[in-house]
Structure formats: structure tokens, C-alpha cells
Amino acid sequence: MASKRKRKEKQKDFAKAKLKVGKTAQKPDNYTDTSFKSKTISLPNQSIASSSNYGASSGASRSSLSTGPSLAVLTHQLSLTKHHSSNTRKEVLNYLQTHLPENPSYYKNIMTSILPLILDEDKEVRKALMSLLSAIFAKQPGLIDLHLRSTILFILSAMSHIIPNIRTTSTHFLRIIVENSHGNLINSYFVKIMRNWFVLMGWSLNEQDSKQLSMAVTTLSITAMNANSKQARIGHLQNLNKFLSKTLQHDQDKDKNKDMKLNITIHPQSYKYLLTDTVQPYQPLKLFVKEFKSEGSGSNGSGISMLDLNTISTEDLDTRKKIMNDVFKPLMIKNLNTFVKEGGEIGREANNCISIVTQACTSSSE
């Protein structure tokens, strides 16, 4: 009897238990429960970003929120400008354009977040950024003057970018700056913009390579340009026309403002004691500058060479005209004439640029 009982107990260890329907297998004796439950504590009223928006139940606070997005919403939307999806970045820019805040203090964060998108690889994102910048400058006219330095930095980087599509739209951003900024501020970047424009168009600034320049221009249109190169060059020349008109032609609005100031002055010679509009009004007199004749100067030693451009201030109109006449005009006219020979719209835009440069240099010589 004892042997049969032991034999049955041993067989139980190797026998498979038959489970009833709806019942789970019995857990072993050494089973350890590893499941756990977590609890979270949410305190939205103590959030730093939305502390001024939560709990605003008064009528005044509700009216202020209706004029634009709250700080928390705006911060979240600006964080999406770095999203990996191009559609998300474009939708954020469209949202910001339709929900521009009334509070001027918010625009510093907005400009800091959207300006790097000038170098965005997606074309639709850059188009949305153009319309957003135009809307911002129309709503806040003096904002561009505060962020002009960083904006010009990104535009110059786009003009010399390795990706052709980014270079194509770079001058369109510059056109927005030219249309919305004051001339005195954009004039200080005249030399840098002209140098990058030569790089963008594939023109050489070295006078020693002038003999090989015509061959370089003809091969450039065949090898270095893509299928949409002609349309891109037309856009570049149109924007160059506006830039040259802004920086090389006399601003008539300043004369109107001066006439208005003279109408309200007490004495006829009061204008002599008023503050000037230029940053360095006596810079052309060169009172505190010791000049040395450079090798690239003209025959009479009064010309401006490429080495002088690094130390010359371009706030003065006559200085910009002299720089154009001595440095940029000869090579620019030679390259623009190649576009004139092509005819069509690109020939008309090149002719307009030539007329502006010629007129400015003629007036400066007089």
C-alpha cells in the first residue's frame, strides 16, 4: 500500500492538470508579484509659464486673452518651429500669422525662434516665413530695426548656402527687409550685401580674373544652374534693383521730414543745431583717419580698393556711390551685359540695374 501511494504522488509531478473553462492556471508557490501602481500630483496653478493665465476669471483678463494667444500657448507653438516635420513647421508659421499677439514684448521670442527658418530646407516653410515676416513688420513697424543685425546675418548665410533652393529665396527675404527698414540701418551693411550678391550670382570680385570672367559667366549658366535658374536669376535681379534704389538713390522722404521740421522751428538756422539722421555725419571729412595709399587705388590715389572696404563706414550716400564706382561697378556692368544679351525679362531687369548704377555713379562724379 505504501509503495502504491508513493508511486501516485510521483506521478502527480509529471501529470498535466486539466483546467476548467474560464479558470487560469494556478501560480507556483515561488511566484513574485512585480506589478506596481504609480500616482502623480498635478499642480497647474504653480506652473511658471502659465501662472498669469490660469485662474483668470475676470472680464479684463478674458478680453486680453482674446486679443492673442497666451504666453503658454505661444511658447508651445514656438517650440514647434524646431519640429522634424516640415508640415508642422509650416502650420506653426501660419498659426502665428493669424494669431499675432498684441503685446509687443512677445515679439522678441517670436523673432528669435523664426529667423533660423530662413535656412530651412523646405520651400513651403520659407514661403510661410516670408508672409509671416511681412505681417509682423506691418503690425510692428519698428521691430525690424531692433532685429536687423541677426536678420541680415541669416540672410547673408542663405545667400552663400550650399543648398541651391535656399540661395534662390535668400534675396526675397532681403527684399522684405529693404521695404520695411529705414535706410540708415540697411546702408551700414551695403558692402557685405554686395559681396554676397557677387557670390550668389557667380561673379568674381578679383580684378586679376577679369579676363576669365566672361567664360566663367557663360559656363555658369550651363553647369552650375538648375532647370529653374533663369527664373531664380530674374528674382535676384529684381531684388537687386530694389536694393540699389534704396541704397544709392536720394531718399525724398527725408527731405519732406526736414521741410516739416523747418516749418515748426523758431529760427531759420535752427536746423544747424538739430540732431542728424545719419550715424556718423562727419565721417566723409575723415578728421580722425590717417589714410595710406593702397596698391589697388586709382591713378590719383583717391580710389577705393578691396582692402579699404573692411574699414569704411557706408552710412554716407556719397561714400556708397564712390564704393560702387571704384569697386563694384566695372565687374557688375560687365556681368549684367551678359544678361542683357539674353533678352526677355532677365534682360529688362539687368538694364534697370545698369541704369541705376550708372546714374548713381554719374551723380557722384559731378
UniProtKB/Swiss-Prot annotation:
Q: Name one GO biological process term.
A: rRNA processing
Q: Which InterPro entries match?
A: ARM-like, ARM-type_fold, Ipi1_N
Its keywords, alphabetically, are: Nucleus, Ribosome biogenesis, rRNA processing
Taken from the UniProt entry, a GO cellular component term is: nucleus
* UniProt KW rRNA processing keyword: yes
Comp. bias regions, Polar residues: 27-38
Q: List the disulfide bonds.
A: none
User: Where in the cell?
Assistant: Nucleus
Chief localisation class? nucleus
Q: Where is this region: Disordered?
A: 1-38
Top-level taxon in the UniProt lineage: Eukaryota
Quaternary structure annotation from Swiss-Prot or TrEMBL? Component of the RIX1 complex, composed of IPI1, RIX1/IPI2 and IPI3 in a 1:2:2 stoichiometry. The complex interacts (via RIX1) with MDN1 (via its hexameric AAA ATPase ring) and the pre-60S ribosome particles.
What this protein is reported to do is described as:
Component of the RIX1 complex required for processing of ITS2 sequences from 35S pre-rRNA.
Q: Which family does it belong to?
A: Belongs to the IPI1/TEX10 family.
What is this protein's record name? Answer: Pre-rRNA-processing protein IPI1-1
- Encoding gene (name): IPI1
